[in-house]
Swiss-Prot record:
Any one GO molecular-function label of the UniProt entry: ATP hydrolysis activity
Classification of source organism: Bacteria, Pseudomonadati, Bdellovibrionota, Bdellovibrionia, Bdellovibrionales
Binding positions (Zn(2+)): H418, H422, D495
NCBIfam families (UniProt xref): FtsH_fam (TIGR01241)
Function description: Acts as a processive, ATP-dependent zinc metallopeptidase for both cytoplasmic and membrane proteins. Plays a role in the quality control of integral membrane proteins.
E.C. number: 3.4.24.-
Pfam families xrefs: AAA (PF00004), AAA_lid_3 (PF17862), FtsH_ext (PF06480), Peptidase_M41 (PF01434)
Protein name: ATP-dependent zinc metalloprotease FtsH 2
Residues annotated to bind ATP: G195, P196, P197, G198, T199, G200, K201, T202
Membrane topology designation: Multi-pass membrane protein
Catalytic site: E419
GO cellular component, one term: plasma membrane
Organism, scientific name: Bdellovibrio bacteriovorus (strain ATCC 15356 / DSM 50701 / NCIMB 9529 / HD100)
Length: 615
């Protein structure tokens, strides 16, 4: 509660107290309180006059002052009771309960609660963006960073060189807009940064502001829409009005998909009209926006497929910049940027770490370096070395070690042969990711063991034989259990899910079926993010085709299972030897794995169907 409101309450209660004291003090000095029995005696004697009778009291005056009082007051008593008490010669009076404070609280307390609630919400709204009170609910609430407030530059952003080159034009425009107008060119009104989470979209936007040394307005799409109708549109207007006053500047809207979803989609419920109204206002502001005003609009999203087409047309967000996962060179650059923040070992091989972190985003790499530093801290080391990074990668990829999860001897044996089956199949095929470590120490939520494979290079395409090899590697654990123990366990459930997904993709998405031919049976739905089970659910085929697809998937998996069984049977001695070493050591490193796999026998290089077709 601010100072004026606090003073108001003090003054209010002070005035109320003064009136109450006056009524109690001065009233008691001029009026005598007498018993009802005395009042009856005075009436019989004719010593009272000017009576005022109310429901509970009788007020009057003495004809002759008594004890210095001219007036009196008494509480009324029921006539029958008064007559009975008078007959008994008893002095009596009636006490009236004082309800002043109760009556006062009955209306003061609710009023105070209402005022307190009002002031609480008013203060909450005031805290948002430095605004003052509920009357400022239509303010945008964007966080403003002054010209020198953004400490990020392009030197702090690595691994996204193409995106940096695109955005460098924005910096040049903000610094010297006349250069772009020399030949009649204009800067795009809006630039949309698109990419998976953690790739550095927000960091890039801050770097643009830091390089250009201009004010930077930052707000998320969800901050525009509130419970009050019309608030979102008002905040959009206020944001652009502030930006025009402080031009040149940058407006950055993070998570644009929260604000710019396609309008009129069936199934949208509460707040739908409010969101559409807010989006319409944003579209109107972009239309009336002059690209020469010195205000650049940047936005970021990882779900461009849900954005309204009107938002992406030319003249609004007319340039899209892809901020993708970094490649090996990009990961190496990101590692070098973040390694400056820790005490790394001078002998650390950054290039090797870049190979180990395939698929990592910039945020993942930053988290990896922090985890590695924590691992080194726990072992009381002076610097962070490569072993710390490997341990951190295992923790991130496979989960935390669960040494307290004790397995019995049979379960340990099953897990050891299961993981060794994966490792043998992975080492048989040159195109499969290299095995770096095998462990039977439980990790994460449900993994009782793991075979760590990391790619040696970035891959963007996979051939049909490589996908079939991958299925064989995944089936290696289940087939090894069956070969050694004559039965299977539930440990391969996750492997079988991945096997089914790959086989289904071969048939329905990639047109790699030898029976059904070059036909795609599931159309992509356009999802940018790779969500498991989503993105390819538009079915466009008959029940007969569905039956043929199921048969082809079963045939592919069966052929790969047979190939896996033959390969493991040919290397049964290595399977048993490797499992025994795992049971003894619990973990096998890459050199130990290479030594173990020297005498592998390559058996049946192609699945059964391919061999039949080649005859």
């Amino acid at each position: 509660m601010n100072e004026p409101n606090r003073n108001f309450f003090w003054i209010f209660f002070l005035i109320l107290g003064i009136f109450w004291l006056q009524s109690v003090w001065f009233g008691s000095r001029t009026v005598q309180q007498i018993p009802y029995s005395q009042y009856e005696s005075l009436v019989k004697q004719g010593d009272v006059q000017n009576l005022i009778v109310t429901e509970n009291h009788i007020r009057g005056e003495f004809k002759q002052p008594q004890n210095g009082f001219k007036s009196f007051v008494t509480n009324r008593v029921e006539p029958e009771l008064a007559k009975e008490l008078s007959g008994a010669g008893v002095t009596y009076r009636r006490e009236i309960e004082n309800t002043f404070f109760r009556d006062l609280l009955s209306w003061v307390v609710p009023a105070l609660i209402f005022v307190a609630v009002f002031l609480y919400f008013s203060r909450k709204f005031a805290e948002k963006g430095g605004m003052s009170g509920l009357m400022s609910v239509g303010k945008s609430g964007a966080r403003l960073y002054a010209e020198t407030g953004v400490k990020v530059s392009f030197g702090d952003v690595a691994g996204v060189e193409e995106a940096k080159a695109e955005l460098y034009e924005v910096v040049q425009f903000l610094k010297s807009p006349q250069e772009f107008g020399r030949l009649g060119a204009r800067m795009p009104k809006g630039i949309l940064l698109v990419g998976p989470p953690g790739t550095g979209k927000t960091l890039l936007a801050k770097a643009v502001a830091g390089e250009a040394q201009v004010p930077f307005y930052s707000i998320t799409g969800s901050e525009f829409v509130e419970m009050f109708v019309g608030v979102g549109a008002a905040r959009v207007r206020d944001l652009f009005e502030q930006a025009r006053k402080n031009a040149p500047c940058i407006i950055f809207i993070d998570e644009l998909d929260a604000l710019g979803k396609v309008r009129g989609v069936a199934g949208s419920f509460g707040g739908h009209d409010e969101k559409e109204q807010t989006l319409n206002q944003l579209l109107a502001e972009l239309d009336g926006f002059d690209s020469r005003s010195g205000v650049v609009i940047l936005a970021a999203t990882n779900r461009p497929e849900v954005l309204d087409p009107a938002l992406l047309r030319a003249g609004r967000f007319d340039r899209q910049v892809l901020v993708d996962r970094p490649d090996r060179t990009g990961r190496e650059q990101i590692l070098r940027v973040h390694l400056k923040k820790i005490k790394a070992d001078e002998a650390l091989n950054v290039e090797h770490l870049a190979h180990l972190t395939s698929g990592f985003t910039g945020a993942d790499i930053a988290n990896l370096i922090n985890e590695a530093a924590m691992v080194a801290t726990r072992r009381k080391a002076e610097t962070v070395n490569e072993k710390d990074f490997v341990a951190a990668i295992e923790r991130i990829v496979a989960g935390l070690e669960k040494k307290s999860r004790l397995l019995n001897e049979k379960e340990k044996a099953i897990v050891a042969h299961h993981e060794m089956g994966h490792a043998i199949m992975a080492c048989l095929f040159p195109g499969v990711d290299k095995v770096q470590k095998i462990s039977i120490i439980p990790r994460g939520l449900g993994a009782l063991g793991y075979t760590m494979q990391r790619p040696t290079e970035d891959r963007y395409l996979m051939t049909r034989p490589e996908l079939l090899d991958k299925i064989c590697v995944l089936l290696g654990g289940r087939v090894a259990e069956e070969l050694i123990f004559g039965e299977v366990s539930t440990g391969a459930s996750d492997d079988l899910v991945r096997v089914t997904n790959i086989a289904e993709a071969l048939v329905t998405r990639y047109g790699m079926s030898e029976v059904l031919g070059n036909i795609v049976f599931e159309q992509p739905t356009g999802n940018f993010l790779e969500v498991p089970g989503a993105g390819y659910r538009s079915r466009t085929y008959s029940e007969k085709s569905a039956t043929e697809i199921d048969q082809e998937i079963r045939q592919i998996v069966a052929a790969c299972a047979l190939r896996t069984r033959e390969s493991l049977a040919a290397n049964l001695s290595i399977l048993k030897k490797g499992a025994a070493q795992l049971l003894e050591k619990e973990t096998l490193s890459e050199p130990e794995i290479e030594l173990l796999m020297r005498d592998l026998v390559v058996k049946n290089a192609a699945p059964q169907r391919e061999r039949d077709l080649s005859v």
